Swiss-Prot record:
InterPro entries: Ald_DH/histidinol_DH, Ald_DH_C, Ald_DH_N, Aldehyde_DH_dom, G-glutamylP_reductase_CS, Glu-5-SA_DH, GPR_dom. Belongs to the gamma-glutamyl phosphate reductase family. The gene is proA. Pathway: Amino-acid biosynthesis; L-proline biosynthesis; L-glutamate 5-semialdehyde from L-glutamate: step 2/2. It is found in: Cytoplasm. One of its GO terms (biological process) is L-proline biosynthetic process. It comes from Streptomyces griseus subsp. griseus (strain JCM 4626 / CBS 651.72 / NBRC 13350 / KCC S-0626 / ISP 5235). GO terms for molecular function: glutamate-5-semialdehyde dehydrogenase activity; NADP binding. Its main location: cytoplasm. Keywords: Amino-acid biosynthesis, Cytoplasm, NADP, Oxidoreductase, Proline biosynthesis. One of its GO terms (cellular component) is cytoplasm. The keyword S-adenosyl-L-methionine does not apply. It catalyses: L-glutamate 5-semialdehyde + phosphate + NADP(+) = L-glutamyl 5-phosphate + NADPH + H(+). This is Gamma-glutamyl phosphate reductase.
């Protein structure tokens, strides 16, 4: 006699989601030690099985080269033994972080004698949709496990072999440590149909977190029936005020743009107050040229570029809304601080904006008027990062206002519930 599974009549994606939901219920109440043991087992397994992972990754890299994929994307796709060791070290760092589950957010004894506590609890089943970055597979799994969640991973089809190998290693380590292996699963299928089904799995999946470019994020936000935490694109701005330290402004600009241009907290637009443009722009353009950055300038920047060694091209409307993720930056001269704020309000993705100024009044007004997750005063945009903020590892930078905003660490992968304890109290 054949015993039917309750999942037999479901699609592969739905089966995966149901198994994740069951696993989430099992791991939610586990003590920190059990979760940390699983994470340490994952780190060890990644190092022991490095050759298996690298071999699978080589398949993806070969296919990417045959398809004419850019070297930048291939670099993000590539896993080396050194990178795998770094990923394993990151997992151990997550294990060392405090467990947010069970933390009392607030509590008190009410006038009627009832004890009331608001405590952190896991979100449940977290779906991650991401592009060709196989390191995200491990990072997301580690953060979700530490916060007591099950995770459904849907990476780019271009990294399918890598992600399959990584999830196999993760599941073996998790199961071997005594936790349910189904707490970590790869969403089956390489087609967009599986992504659409995941986005419509409301009731099975508690939240979706997209990580990638603007097109991916927009698709998930617009088409998903599952609640989404939007890890937005990073169209970040640096505004150089009329009252400024020129050398500091150049240093902050170059660090914000050129230190690592392919990340979401890199600056994409430079705004310069007209009163300091003649003094600042020649310095800035030469420094940007030395860093290999192409400037997409408005007419005021172009007029001041004569004699500069910088590559300056005319800016178009599209430049103001572009997250380049490359050695390119848009630049404009503005009439006032308020004009800079107006430009930011119109074009920013709400990630990070910086002002460089010696005026406390200007800094105060800028921080009050700019509505982004992070507003930096005399500091690089590159500081918007969970590790830099002292929060530990992050799953992304949320640019929305509900549930989480800014770097999303372990606490942001939890919700809360209220514990009401009485002594026969009735109302």
């Amino acid at each position: 006699m054949t015993t039917l599974s309750p999942y037999d009549n479901l699609s592969p994606v739905a089966q995966t989601a149901y198994r994740a939901r069951a696993a989430a219920a099992d791991i939610a109440p586990l003590p920190r030690a059990a979760k940390d043991d699983a994470l340490l087992a994952i780190a060890d397994a990644l190092e022991v099985r490095t050759s298996e992972i690298v071999e699978a990754n080589a398949e993806d890299v070969e296919r990417a080269r045959e398809a004419g994929t850019s070297e930048g994307i291939i670099d993000r796709l590539t896993l080396t033994p050194e990178r795998i060791r770094a990923i394993a070290a990151d997992v151990r760092d997550v294990a060392a972080l405090p467990d947010p589950v069970g933390e009392v957010v607030r509590g008190s004894t009410l006038p009627n004698g009832i004890d009331l506590r608001q405590v952190r609890v896991p979100l449940g089943v977290v779906g991650i949709i991401y592009e060709a970055r196989p390191n995200v597979t491990v990072d997301a799994a580690a953060l979700c496990l530490k916060s007591g969640n099950a995770v459904l991973l849907r990476g780019s089809s271009s990294a399918y072999a890598s992600n399959t190998a990584l999830v196999r290693v993760l599941r073996d380590a998790v199961g071997g440590s005594g936790l349910p292996a189904d707490a970590v699963q790869l969403v089956p299928g390489e087609s967009r149909d599986s992504v659409r089904e995941l986005m419509r799995a409301r009731g099975l999946v508690d939240v979706l977190i997209p990580r990638g470019g603007a097109s991916l994020i927009r698709t998930v936000v617009e088409e998903s029936t599952v609640p989404v935490i939007e890890t937005g694109t990073g169209n970040c701005h640096v505004y150089v005020d009329a009252q400024t330290d020129l050398a500091m402004a150049v240093d902050i600009l170059i660090n914000s743009k050129a230190q690592r241009p392919s990340v979401c907290n890199a600056a994409e637009t430079l705004l310069v107050h007209k009163d300091v443009a003649d003094a600042f722009l020649p310095l800035a353009l030469d420094a940007l040229a030395d860093a290999g950055v192409t400037v997409h300038g408005d007419e005021h920047v172009l007029a001041r570029a004569e004699g500069s060694k910088a590559t300056v091209v005319p800016a178009t409307t599209e430049d103001w809304e572009t997250e380049y993720l490359s050695y390119d930056i848009a630049a404009a001269v503005v009439d006032s601080l308020d004009a800079a704020v107006a430009h930011i309000r119109l074009w920013s993705s709400g990630h990070t904006e910086a002002i460089v100024t010696t005026s406390q009044a200007a800094a105060r007004r800028f921080t009050q008027l700019v509505d982004s997750t992070t507003v930096a005063v005399n500091a690089s945009t590159r500081f918007t990062d969970g590790g830099q903020f002292g929060f530990g590892a992050e799953i992304g930078i949320s640019t929305q206002k509900l549930h989480a905003r800014g770097p999303m660490g372990l606490p942001e992968l939890t919700s809360t519930k209220y514990i009401v304890t009485g002594d026969g109290h009735t109302r």
